[in-house]
UniProtKB/Swiss-Prot annotation:
The keyword Acetylation applies. It is found in: Peroxisome membrane. Expressed in developing siliques. InterPro entries: PEX11. Belongs to the peroxin-11 family. It is a multi-pass membrane protein. One of its GO terms (molecular function) is identical protein binding. This is Peroxisomal membrane protein 11D.
Length: 236
């Protein structure tokens, strides 16, 4: 009975910890937003209203969030990182920070505080292009980092000779990191499609339903990436 209660308490603590993260709540709202976009298919109705209202609400979560990527822009990079990956990483930070900053003006426009509607819409499109550019940079960074991980894993395999590579702690750590980067690569590549859909760059191919489906999947991936580590329950 005590063990069952301990497990339940630990599970609830994980849920509380997860929901206390502003980023996690934002991604859950994002899943609702794009799920509604998928259901509406761009047609007027309840689902489209949920899509629009959730999109506006999410912008409040992101107020002053651009500071995070500004900090990343000026922060030092790990030693040994190739220059192309450094430049791509810094470009991603700059573009994402610009997107988040401009998104605040979009929120001011849609909430009626900023009266120049045309300029707000223009800045909205520019911000989406910045987000699309940051997703492209992220995709290229993940491809490059996965290549570096693959190379170092092959070196470990050669060093082990006939040993079991999965019993090597360093190899397992790099394999886990590689899996995480693979998931991040899928997410960033799909986000490029989402951005293209929001910008209506290929409206006949990337329809609101396609945009909603891709956005929902990337939101679920983001929610998964933010999951806290499960604590080990001591058994008597």
């Amino acid at each position: 009975m005590g063990t069952t209660l301990d497990v339940s308490r630990a599970e609830l603590a994980l849920v509380v910890m997860y929901l206390n993260k502003a980023e996690a709540r934002d991604k859950l709202c994002r899943a609702i937003q794009y799920g509604s976009k998928f259901l509406s298919g761009g047609q007027p109705g309840t689902a489209q209203n949920v899509d629009k209202s959730t999109s506006l609400a999410r912008k409040v979560f992101r107020l002053f969030k651009f500071v995070n990527d500004l900090h990343g822009l000026i922060s030092p990079v790990p030693k040994g990182t190739p220059l192309p990956l450094v430049l791509l990483g810094k470009s991603k930070n700059a573009l994402l920070s610009t997107f988040l900053f401009l998104d605040q003006i979009v929120w001011l426009g849609r909430s009626g505080i900023y009266k120049n509607k045309e300029r707000a819409e223009l800045l909205g499109r520019i911000s989406l292009f910045c987000w699309m550019g940051s997703s492209v940079c992220t995709t290229l960074v993940e491809v490059g980092e996965m290549g570096r991980l693959s190379s170092s894993m092959k070196k470990i395999e050669k060093g082990l000779k006939n040993g079991n590579k999965y019993q090597d702690e360093d190899y397992r750590a790099k394999l886990k990191k590689s899996n995480e980067r693979s998931l991040a690569l899928i997410k960033s590549a799909m986000d490029i499609v989402v951005a293209a859909g929001l910008l209506q760059l290929a409206p006949t191919k990337i329809t609101p339903r396609v945009t909603g489906a891709f956005g929902f999947i990337t939101s679920i991936i983001s929610c998964y990436q933010l999951l806290p580590t499960r604590p080990k329950i001591k058994t008597p």
